[in-house]
A protein has these predicted regions:
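Residue in the alpha/beta-hydrolase core beta-strand immediately N-terminal to the catalytic nucleophile
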Residues: 35, 72, 95-98
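Active-site loop/oxyanion-hole signature of alpha/beta-hydrolase fold enzymes
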Residues: 30, 38-71, 88-89, 114-117
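Short beta-strand/loop motif that positions the catalytic acidic residue
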Residues: 170-172
Length: 223
């Protein structure tokens, strides 16, 4: 049995991973889709102080509270920042990492520095409304909520590399529209024999567009 913690991307809550989590449980695994502070059902906690450190702490605290010691962390999009930070904080609790069309930061990186120009425009385009939140894009699921801007701007601080973990998978959405901020991470994974790199016929929302293929990749991490 493998325990998965599933971390959504910007503006999304645990709901975006719940169908996948149900299928993982049907295969005998534990699965914890998480809603980060200030988002989804926790949107009432959104304020200017919520940042990347807050979201890393969300995951670290979940691992401690549930006494999870061999987790596979799965991060979609922005969630790649979060799982990297959490794995660095408590490497003794982490067995593997799966980046789903996600950022794979190095020390000092942020979403802002890794993003495309279009993404940076989105991050700050509607922030003037309250000064601290990025609005969901029009085509997002109706359940999407504003995302704390500070978490997209803050640089990550890491003490070690990803070579500490047994398995590392990168899932690239090969049919995304326009310039992809995630292609460089996929290409690095493809060239590194310590990674397993997967290109799926999917747009960015892989959980929705390629659920069967993503499930197979996650199940393979537990083999």
């Amino acid at each position: 049995m493998t325990t998965f913690v599933l971390v959504p991307g910007a503006c999304h809550g645990a709901w975006c991973f719940e169908p996948l989590a149900r299928r993982l449980r049907q295969h005998g695994h534990e699965a914890y889709p998480i809603t980060l502070t200030g988002l989804g059902a926790r949107k009432h906690l959104l304020n200017a102080s919520v940042n990347l450190d807050t979201h890393v702490a969300d995951v670290v605290n979940l691992l401690a509270d549930e006494q999870i010691t061999d987790v596979v962390l799965v991060g979609h999009s922005y969630g790649g920042m979060v799982i990297t930070g959490a794995a660095d904080r408590v490497p003794e609790r982490v067995d593997g990492l799966v980046y789903v069309d996600a950022f794979v930061p190095e020390d000092g990186d942020s979403c802002w520095t890794l993003a495309t120009d279009d993404q940076r425009h989105w991050y700050i385009g509607d922030a003037h409304a309250n000064g601290y939140a990025t609005a969901p894009l029009p085509f997002f699921d109706p359940r999407a909520t504003p995302h704390p801007l500070a978490s997209l701007i803050q640089s990550i601080r890491l003490r070690g590399g990803l070579d500490r973990f047994r398995s590392k998978d990168y899932v690239y959405a090969a049919e995304g529209e326009g310039e992809s901020a995630f292609k460089p991470a996929y290409e690095r994974a493809l060239a590194d024999p310590s990674w397993r790199a997967h290109a799926l016929a999917s747009r960015h929302n892989v959980m929705r567009d390629a659920p069967d293929e993503l499930l197979k990749i996650l199940l393979a991490t537990s083999a």
